[in-house]
């Protein structure tokens, strides 16, 4: 892999920025398609909303990375915190901040939050999958050494090389990209069936949290935080638990409401 596409003067054009931008762009395109297919006219808001959540998500992803993953470095390099083009974005923080921004946007425009979220959820994970290619090209979010003669060898300009040298590393970013695409397929499959509002989004949170929790055992770019677990694993456990409880709550209510409707519709 290569970090740089070219240099314009002394300014580097990084593959990280290109693939990160492509993740946002193609995520918005997919969201537009899904919402237009849904037929409720919400697709007209995609690009305005996309700009909003992209901006807020970048801020959230950066702050999450700085304070939960790399504070040991950044507390001595505070001026580098805004340098997002160098890499260092936490997906979990980006998604959380983006969801908060999206909630207020949808409320302002009187768009039902849960149906909208369910419809665009596959686009979110699709954008994440492309974003992991950015991490791979940049040599961050890397795995720890495999301890064998197989694995990924990163260029000497990357953080992965500066951390572990010329040791083969587990392809953590590649596995997450592949896992995201599998989750995308499962979400599209689930959307084909009748289900309670909000459960598609909850399913996304649960599946991604599980994927992230187990992949963190292979990550080598930061250490454990508590109980032998990393910060992303603790966040994943909390996210999975909350999403599961909400999924069950929504599903039970949906079944109860459906039963009432069927009962009221029976001839007497």
Feature roles, as predicted:
Residues 1-268:
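A feature for loop-to-transmembrane-helix boundaries and adjacent hydrophobic helices
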């Amino acid at each position: 892999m290569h970090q740089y596409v070219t240099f314009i003067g002394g300014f580097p054009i990084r593959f990280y920025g290109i693939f990160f931008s492509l993740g946002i762009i193609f995520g918005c395109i997919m969201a537009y398609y899904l919402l237009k297919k849904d037929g409720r006219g919400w697709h007209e808001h995609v690009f305005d909303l996309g700009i909003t959540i992209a901006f807020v998500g970048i801020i959230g992803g950066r702050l999450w990375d700085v304070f939960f993953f790399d504070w040991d470095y950044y507390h001595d390099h505070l001026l580098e915190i805004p340098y997002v083009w160098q890499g260092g974005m936490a997906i979990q923080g980006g998604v959380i901040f983006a969801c908060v921004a999206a909630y207020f946007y949808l409320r302002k425009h009187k768009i039902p939050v849960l149906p909208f979220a369910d419809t665009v959820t596959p686009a979110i994970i699709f954008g994440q999958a492309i974003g992991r290619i950015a991490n791979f090209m940049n040599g961050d979010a890397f795995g720890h050494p495999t301890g064998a003669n197989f694995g990924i060898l990163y260029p000497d300009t990357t953080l992965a090389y500066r951390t572990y040298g010329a040791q083969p590393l587990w392809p953590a970013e590649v596995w997450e990209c592949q896992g995201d695409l599998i989750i995308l397929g499962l979400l599209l499959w689930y959307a084909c069936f009748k289900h309670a509002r909000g459960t598609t989004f909850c399913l996304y949170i649960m599946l991604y949290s599980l994927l992230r929790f187990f992949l963190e055992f292979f990550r080598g770019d930061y250490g454990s935080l508590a109980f032998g677990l990393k910060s992303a694993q603790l966040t994943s456990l909390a996210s999975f638990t909350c999403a599961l409880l909400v999924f069950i709550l929504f599903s039970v209510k949906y079944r109860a409401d459906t039963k009432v409707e069927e009962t009221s519709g029976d001839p007497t």
